[in-house]
Regions:
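Catalytic grooves of carbohydrate-active enzymes
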Residues: 62-66, 213-217, 291-293, 308-334, ...
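Cytoplasmic C-terminal tails of single-pass
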Residues: 652-671
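Intrinsically disordered, low-complexity Pro/Gly/Ser/Thr-rich segments with frequent PxxP/GP/PP motifs
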Residues: 99-135, 569-594
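Terminal connector regions
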Residues: 131-163, 511, 593-632, 636, ...
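Contiguous beta-strand segments within globular domains
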Residues: 40-78, 82, 536-544
């Protein structure tokens, strides 16, 4: 808690530093009567299109200005304010709740400065870091300085605007802390219940902004892309979409992407409803889609980006799936209790998740990005200046640089103002005291890291979809095994089931109903033709069946035959049914007894053995006597043969005697 106390102490000092200070401005070259605050004409505007931000040594800075006020301007004033004391002081000044004192000023006459073809004006002003000289801006100490730029016509201020510069000492070696900009490409589901997908204008525009941002930003960023949106973009028949897809893949080279489920899901609700296995399948599908569509791009599968609050039960399961890092967006940080500020990497409380890191996007910076005003240059500079102020606060409060993770993003992760983020990234890149990196990979934590306490279990559900999703999953896993591995229906059905559990989809029942209709359509393409009865004249034989496949591709099934008075020597093999044809199948059987009895024939899926057709019942006749009956029959046959032999011999004796019964001929010697 020491770090939190130190930050609170800094915040108290901010109240004094940010208090309104009225300092008379003596503008060089004007009369004493002009030393007070000039009149302000509020109708005109002035915007900063480009400016320097980092100042290491004295520099002739150039500010490119635009706006309606420039048409009647004769001078531009630069008012350098007292440097900000800390982040709270910075926000009070940036949000116009406080006006800091002016420590230096410079006036530039613009009547001799050539204007651009677009009416812009590039105004030079010297920022001096060594000494104060006439008509320059002296920034004596390192820190973030507010700078007011105002346009005047004589004594009348036509317009003014606020920006910041960051003065750093090149001789001082600062302690670097990690920082990253997080950007996410997502949007409403692009698939329909009938299996088709369409990229609408909003999704296309979001993708263009995302790609343009990647092409312009030179530093490392943390990225996540919705696999479902990427899938639709890759399959779009529009030539411009194909070009956009290739631009995206080119812009991602050398970067990594955080894996995600195929569409946005609520892991807490799925865990509550007992759908942990479905959550696992959703993530596997999303990861497989990214790997298939982004070959050569590193897919980070160890980080989970949470947009809604998590509980300990869900975090424990995510850890079992291999997630070792959590990124909490502003919506996911609600209800958690922290031992340290959100900028400090932490771990979930409890021993079950001790090696899972927790990082949080900055809530205040997210609010700034969500309501970004002014030009991209001004918004980007403000973001960079606030990040540096936050960094200085953390270091001053004693935070270990290795434990700091500054994550900049909008509230949703979407690129609300990509141009401003580009300016911020460029301003922060190679800034003293900061190290810009991709935070999508694993972040090492130990028990020494502070804890973040999550609720034990949250009561969010999918609203009664549990049974429908479970039943659809069982049917899908079984029936898709009937198709060849490369059949596109396999992927389409998996995608439909994934979309049905997304909280952003209002017509989830239509996706499930459409999926089950497709599954039934495939099973209906298989028909079974059986004889009404069969006759077996020996102990073993075969049952001959015919299967017809009316589908356009080969279909695979198994034949399951059962009877209480028959044995089936072989397990049912997978049978390939050729498209549009009839296949004859012979099932080996072995009779246990003779007589008439029913034989039930079922056609089932290769996996899961889900019934494909209605069962057929065949009457079997077994006429062969087996076992003891065969022994008795042989014995009777032998008796019959013996009787016949005896009868034959008696007949021979009656007709002329049996030669075997006549005495031997010859002389018998006397005894």
């Amino acid at each position: 808690m020491t770090l939190l106390r130190n930050l609170r102490t800094l915040a108290v000092g901010a109240a004094v530093a940010a208090a309104p200070v009225a300092v008379p401005l003596a503008v060089p070259g004007t009369s004493a009567a002009r030393a007070g605050r000039p009149d302000v004409a509020t109708a005109a505007t002035v915007d900063i299109l480009a400016q320097p931000f980092r100042v290491l040594t004295s520099v002739n800075a150039r500010f490119t200005l635009a706006g309606t006020s420039l048409a009647g301007a004769d001078s531009v004033d630069f008012l350098l304010h007292r440097r900000v004391a800390n982040r709270d002081s910075f926000r009070a000044i940036a949000d116009n709740f406080a006006e800091p004192g002016v420590i230096d000023s410079a006036v530039v006459r613009v009547n001799r400065i050539p204007r651009g073809d677009d009416g812009t004006l590039t105004v030079p002003v010297t920022v001096n870091t060594a000494q104060s000289t006439r008509n320059d801006l002296f920034a004596p100490q390192p820190g973030v300085y507010p700078l007011t730029v105002r346009v005047r016509d004589g004594d009348t201020v036509l317009a003014s605007t606020l920006t910041f510069i960051d003065r750093r000492d090149p001789e001082t070696v600062p302690t670097n802390v990690p920082i990253s900009i997080f950007a996410q490409l997502t949007g409403p589901v692009t698939h329909s219940p009938d299996g088709t997908s369409t990229l609408d204008d909003d999704a296309r525009a979001n993708t263009v902004r995302f790609v343009t941002f990647l092409e312009q930003v030179g530093s490392a960023v943390t990225l996540q892309i919705q696999p479902e949106l990427l899938d639709t973009l890759s399959e779009s028949p529009e030539p411009l979409d194909a070009q956009l897809f290739e631009r995206l893949r080119a812009a991602l080279r050398g970067r990594s992407v955080i894996a995600s489920t195929y569409t946005a899901v609520d892991p807490v609700a799925m865990m509550h409803d007992g759908l942990s296995a479905e959550l696992t399948e959703q993530f596997r599908l999303g990861e497989a889609t990214l790997n298939r569509l982004l070959p050569g791009i590193t897919i980070q599968r160890s980080t989970w980006v949470a947009h809604d609050p998590l509980d300990r039960r869900t975090i424990g399961f995510l850890g079992q799936l291999g997630f070792t890092s959590l990124v909490l967006m502003p919506g996911a940080a609600e209800g958690v209790e922290r031992e340290q500020p959100g900028a400090i990497v932490s771990r979930p409380a409890g021993k079950e998740s001790v090696f899972v890191s927790v990082m949080s996007t900055d809530v205040q910076l997210a609010a700034t990005l969500d309501g970004s005003l002014g030009t991209a240059a001004q918004s980007g500079v403000r973001i960079a200046a606030e990040v540096i102020s936050q960094r200085d606060d953390l270091v001053a409060a004693g935070a270990a640089p290795a434990d700091v993770r500054l994550l900049v993003s909008s509230s949703t992760g979407e690129l609300v103002d990509p141009d401003a983020l580009v300016v911020a990234a460029r301003s922060l890149s190679n800034a003293p005291g900061l190290f810009v990196q991709d935070l999508g990979g694993p972040q090492v934590v130990t028990e020494r890291n502070p804890a973040t306490v999550f609720p034990e279990a949250l009561n969010r559900t999918l609203g009664g979809l549990k049974t429908s999703i479970q039943q659809a999953r069982r049917e899908l896993d079984a029936i898709q095994s009937m198709l060849p591995a490369d059949d596109p229906r396999r992927a389409r059905w998996l995608e439909s089931l994934a979309i049905s559990s997304s909280p952003g989809v209002s017509n989830t029942a239509e996706f499930i109903d459409g999926l089950r209709s497709d599954l039934r359509r495939l099973t209906a393409s298989v028909s079974l033709v059986t004889p009404s009865d069969i006759t077996l004249s020996s102990r073993t034989g075969t049952v001959r069946l015919q299967l017809r496949n009316d589908d356009d591709v080969p279909v695979f099934v198994r034949i399951a035959v059962s009877s209480p008075k028959m044995q089936f020597p072989q397990d049912p093999d997978v049978i390939e049914l050729l498209p549009g044809g009839t296949t004859e199948v012979q099932v080996p059987v072995k009779a246990r007894t003779n007589g008439r009895f029913p034989v039930t024939v079922r056609v089932v899926t290769p996996i899961g053995r889900v019934q494909v057709t209605s069962p057929a019942v065949i009457t079997a006749r077994v006429s062969e006597v087996a076992g003891l009956g065969q022994l008795v029959s042989i014995s009777l046959l032998l008796v019959l043969l013996a009787w016949w032999w005896n009868s034959w011999r008696r007949g021979r004796r009656t007709d002329g005697g049996d030669p075997l019964d006549e005495p031997p001929t010859g002389t018998v010697s006397a005894q």
